[in-house]
Structures are given as C-alpha cells and as structure tokens.
Amino acid sequence: MRKTHPVNALKKLGIGLAFGAATIMSMPTSALACTQMYMGKNYTADGNTYYGRAEDFDKRYLKHYGIEPAHEPGFKYSSIESAFEYTSNKPTYRYSYVRDHPSNWMGRTDAYSEAGINEKGVSCSATLSTSYNEEADAADHIDEKVGLGEYSYGSIILGESATAREGVELLGRLIDDQGVCTNDQIIIADNNETWLFATLSAHQWIAMKLADDVASLNPNIGSLNYDVDLDDPENCLHSEGIESMPVEKGFAKYSADGKFDVAQTYGESLADSGVNQWSRYVQGRDYFGSQLTEGTDYDIITVKKDGKPDQKGAMVSEIQPLFFRPGKSGWSTFELIRAFGNRGENVPGLNANTDGVYCIGSERNTEINLFQIRRGYDPEVATIQWEMLSRAAYSVAIPLYSALITEVSPYFSDQTVSFDHCKQTDVVYNEEPENSINYVLMDISSLCFENPDTLGISVRAYLDALQNELIEQNKEVDAAMLAETTTEGRTALANKAGKAATENTYVK
C-alpha cells in the first residue's frame, strides 16, 4: 500500500498550490509494506479456501468497517490519487468496506475500500503494492497522475461486479483504456473462483485463477515467479500486449523451456528487492512448513544506507516462487488468522522480537482481512469476512457475513469519530472514544508492543482464547444462517450476529 497523492490531483480540484503542498505533507506517504496470503481448499481442515492481506502503514492509524449502499445508474467513481474517473451505466451493488479516515483525505469518505464483500457475494482484498523493472518502465511508463489505482480498485470491483470474473474483466478494460497509476496485486473471489490480478506496467496486466492445491505468500515482491498458460482463458486473462509489447521493445524474458516468463519480464530484479520484503517471505514460508534454508536459499545481511537506519534481514540467492505447497494439510481458521501475527519467532536470526528485523505481524499493521470461502454455497452466505482493525500480533478477527450486512455495529467507530486519539503516546491516561473497538484494539496492541515480555505474553494468550471462542460461536451462527432460506431472514441474522460478535469482543 502506497497512499501517494500527486500535486496535480489537488490542482484539478481547484486547490491552491501553497495549500496543496501543505496538505500533501500532512497526508499519508509511500508505504510499501503489506503481506498477501492464499491457502487453497485442499490444505485446509474445513475444505474452504482462504485469502487475505495485512496492511502496514503506521503504528497508530485508524481504519473503519462500513457499508456502501447501492446507487442508481450514473454513479461516478473518482480518485484524488490520480485523475481516474468512471461512471457506472447500471445500478451499483451494496458492499462492505474497510476505509481510511476522511481527515487523511481532504474529507473524502471513499478512500481505499480495501476489503469487503458485495451483495452478490464477490469479495476482494486490495492492494498489495509491487514494483516493475527499469525496462518495463521505459517501455510502458506508469504515470502517477492518471489511471486506475488503489484508491479506487475495491470500490470499482465491489460496486460493479456480480462475479469475480466480471471484476477481473472490468479492471482489465479500465486499464486497457486509462492505464494504472501504481503497480499492484489484488485478489478477487466469489463462491466458485478466486483470482489473483496483477498490474504489470501502465497498460499490461494479468489475472490467474488460483488453484486448490497451492498456497501463496507475497510481501510486496513483483517478481515472485509463476508458471502460467497465456492461451488458457478459463484460468488466465491478460492484456493483449502482455508478450508482444516486451518482444517489440526488446526486453521479453523466457524460461529454460522457452516459455514466456511474465514475472521475470516485468518484475523488479533481485538487486532491487529489499531485506524487509524477503524477511517476511522467509518468515511466512517457515510458518507454513515450507522452510527455506539459511546459507543456501538465503543469508541474513545488514544493509547500510546513507542517512537512514541500518536494515537487517534476509536476502535470497535467487527469486522465489509465488506459489508453493505447505508442509502440512489441515490448516484451521485459527492458524490462518494467526499467520498474519507471525513475527518470525521460530526463524533463527529473523525473530522480530529479538533480532530487530521486519516481520509480517508488524507494529505498523493497520488492518488485516481474511476471507473464508465455501465453494458452491449460495453467494449470500458463501464467504465470511474475518476482520481485524488493528495490529495482528495483538488483535482479534471478528466474523462478518458482509454480503448481507446492512447495519454496522455501533462498536465499530464510523468515519465521524476523531482521528486525534491515533496521536496519543500515553494510552493509559488518555482513554479512547467511547464504544470504539477500533481504538480499543489499537491501544491494547500499543501497550503490548511496549511490554512484550510481560503484558504481551499474557494478553496474547487471552486473545487466543477469545479468538477460538469466536470461531466456535460462529459455527453455531453459521448453522442458523445456512438453515435460513430467505434473503430477509439471512440479512436480519447477519446484522444481529455481526453486532453481537463485535460487542462481545469489545466487552471482553
């Protein structure tokens, strides 16, 4: 996640340059640190597919869960990160979102619908920021002033798409027409298919239907390699010039068997990747039992940069795969939730608690989403959104039937709550706004990160027990949800269950 704001966008809105420059300084700046995960159903205990993402941005940064209503034809999507605009030619769909606070976006309430499910059962997690190489940049340069970007991906996908494939195809058409303003990866799913969509350069893109017998972990690396058949439209969709453009420009790369290598052609080189990224990759592979070997697959190094703190972390000997097979099957909902809190505790030299390295369960997590998809179920109930609005190392994921929810728990602070509590350094004597689970979890994690060896240990044990309780309770809710056959009845139950789970978590 980058969160960049070009000056031209402020000019376009008629704001003076002097004010615009000051505003930019107060807005979020580039933050290339998120971790995306996927676990195919063949490896899970319940036979469900799971995917999600941890967003990293700042130690105390407020996020909001809410519902965007449906709109009449003519609804306009726009952005202040670029000049992108799109007007819908049909009624839009209601969807859930996780968004930023308006105070960080000039009062805009639509910034970054990064995780949600729409009323048709389409879900998405957006975005994982990536990078492209110099040759791709020279051939098809990304102009940050124009094109579709992470400010709008989620809103467009969820507001417009009745299936995951529709979402993929719509993004592709928009990129063909307007280009993109950033390199990103997005996961889009429904009750039948899960797709990984990647923007490769300004106008080149690829989408791959994810298999049931693989896992995936990506900590912002655009060059993780994969094998894909570009001539199989059932499982792969892509821009028309994905291969012909780099061939014409002279930078196309091919594997040893003569197959066009998408990741190597467009992705950043190994030399341009960073130790913070590879540390998370090694930590994640270890968590999933598909370990890399220090001294063979990677080394632990310290990078010194002029004027910046030293960075200690992992650097691999060669580019690693985007997809792998975990070391076991039977992954549980709890284990997959906790994967986002992984701090490398079992990796010698890459334990964030003792070795000063970056990690997946970072103190800079702001929001974590995990989608549990039951293949073939009715789209209204097929997907459960497990949502954490604070740092995964010391947080709890709340289960939400977001395709049906129309009433958000009052314990989820809406976008009218003050952002000021994020700036507090002494959370013991500065209480959070009343009935705000967003701030409660933020404050708990702040205290635990300050006291990891004392408070952190006991709180994590308590939160684990609470998380398991939520998982077990939701099985009872799910049985009732599946027994209900009407949309009205399911909606009432989804609203009631979401409010109860949120309030109970807040109270406990």
List each language-model region with its residue ranges:
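Accessory, solvent-exposed terminal regions and/or long lumenal/extracellular loops of proteins
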Residues: 285, 290-354, 358-363
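Histidine-centered catalytic/metal-binding microenvironments
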Residues: 449-508
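Substrate-recognition/cap regions that form aromatic- and gly/pro-loop-enriched pockets
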Residues: 345-469
